[in-house]
Amino acid sequence: MRDHVAGRYAKALFDLALEHHVLDQAEADVRTLGEVLHATPELASVLENPSISAEELKQVLQTSFTGFNTIVLNTILVMVENDRASEVLSLPEHFIALLNEHRNVATAIVTSAYKLSDEELTNVKETFGQKSGKTLEVENVVDTNVIGGLRVQIGYTTYDGTIETKLTRLERELLKA
């Protein structure tokens, strides 16, 4: 349920930020919110604590995020007023997903046997950016179970060029013959 509700608030925030031409400021504020919530588990606990009143929560949030754009801060406060304080924890993830979709940006998770160099990551970014038609942000995940090659996941699409997969395909072909 949390994801669904947080997604609706994120969409409303995104639409308002776009309409008022403050998308970059909203992005910065929402990223900061996500970082603060991640770095301060105490604040996350406060948001999930039903025994803390909405007024107390609003005071804490207004004090903590005074420099935030009014639209971002008001969205968070409305969530608290509507008894959705715990949903604030998922707001950054949903907002950034909407922003990336709007900007035609996707995350490519590149799994390899070793940490790839910047040059290798740039090559992956360019090659798979062309295939997907998106601007890619690349994350390199090292998996020691990968013998060699790469596995690239962009959204729900996986390009598997690992040696293990190639050997499995070869085995199937040989068994057919």
UniProtKB/Swiss-Prot annotation:
Q: What is one cellular component GO term in this UniProt entry?
A: plasma membrane
The places in or outside the cell where this protein is found are: Cell membrane
Q: Which domain of life is it from?
A: Bacteria
Quote the PROSITE patterns the UniProt record gives: ATPASE_DELTA
Gene3D superfamilies for the chain: N-terminal domain of the delta subunit of the F1F0-ATP synthase
Q: How does it sit in the membrane?
A: Peripheral membrane protein
**Listed Pfam families:** OSCP
Q: What InterPro entries has UniProt attached to this entry?
A: ATP_synth_OSCP/delta_N_sf, ATPase_OSCP/d_CS, ATPase_OSCP/dsu
On subunit structure and binding partners, the annotation says: F-type ATPases have 2 components, F(1) - the catalytic core - and F(0) - the membrane proton channel. F(1) has five subunits: alpha(3), beta(3), gamma(1), delta(1), epsilon(1). F(0) has three main subunits: a(1), b(2) and c(10-14). The alpha and beta chains form an alternating ring which encloses part of the gamma chain. F(1) is attached to F(0) by a central stalk formed by the gamma and epsilon chains, while a peripheral stalk is formed by the delta and b chains.
Family the UniProt entry places it in: Belongs to the ATPase delta chain family.
What task does this protein carry out? F(1)F(0) ATP synthase produces ATP from ADP in the presence of a proton or sodium gradient. F-type ATPases consist of two structural domains, F(1) containing the extramembraneous catalytic core and F(0) containing the membrane proton channel, linked together by a central stalk and a peripheral stalk. During catalysis, ATP synthesis in the catalytic domain of F(1) is coupled via a rotary mechanism of the central stalk subunits to proton translocation. This protein is part of the stalk that links CF(0) to CF(1). It either transmits conformational changes from CF(0) to CF(1) or is implicated in proton conduction.
Q: What is this protein called?
A: ATP synthase subunit delta
Source organism of the structure: Exiguobacterium sibiricum (strain DSM 17290 / CCUG 55495 / CIP 109462 / JCM 13490 / 255-15)
Q: Which gene encodes it?
A: atpH
